């Protein structure tokens, strides 16, 4: 996705593992935002549940706070404005990270069977894989799973202890 024209905007917790996307952001070719990784993880769960967003104190009085930098990393993001909203909830200042539709979730699985069951036993971390897939599903988006050809197996051959989700 780190090619010009494939992305319009990105909201991420860090860019260290995506140097080409980082370059697009630095060259102001995409709107780039930086949000706390934990908030992004929780936001996927909120989107998956069909809720309006994440309400939290995390990010107040930091670069994410819309009264400061709003998490905006470049001019293109500043043109769009802050993604995060500051709100008053029960007399306390909070930040609201609104839900947005997930059009496509790109996921790698260790094994996938012919019915779409996905196992993740060889992945380095489970991280947010399931909530991302669920968020795309709830949004009416697509879940695209990559797997090595030799790891596309017959239905019933997966160890069910490692099946984490189903893609149909």
Predicted regions: what they are:
Residues 1-168:
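Conserved alpha/beta enzyme-core scaffold
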């Amino acid at each position: 996705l780190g090619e010009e024209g494939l992305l319009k905007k990105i909201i991420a917790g860090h860019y260290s593992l995506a140097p080409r996307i980082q370059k697009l952001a630095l060259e102001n070719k995409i709107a780039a935002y930086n949000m706390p990784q934990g908030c992004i993880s929780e936001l996927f769960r909120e989107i998956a549940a069909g809720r309006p967003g994440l309400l939290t104190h995390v990010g107040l009085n930091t670069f994410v706070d819309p009264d400061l930098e709003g998490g905006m990393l470049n001019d293109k993001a500043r043109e769009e404005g802050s993604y995060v909203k500051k709100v008053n909830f029960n007399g306390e200042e909070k930040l609201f990270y609104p839900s947005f539709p997930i059009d496509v979730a790109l996921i790698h699985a260790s094994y996938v069977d012919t019915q779409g069951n996905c196992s993740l036993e060889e992945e380095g971390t489970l991280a947010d894989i399931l909530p991302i897939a669920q968020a795309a599903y709830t949004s009416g988006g697509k879940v695209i799973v990559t797997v090595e050809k030799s790891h596309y197996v017959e239905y019933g051959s997966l160890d069910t202890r490692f099946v984490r989700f189903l893609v149909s």
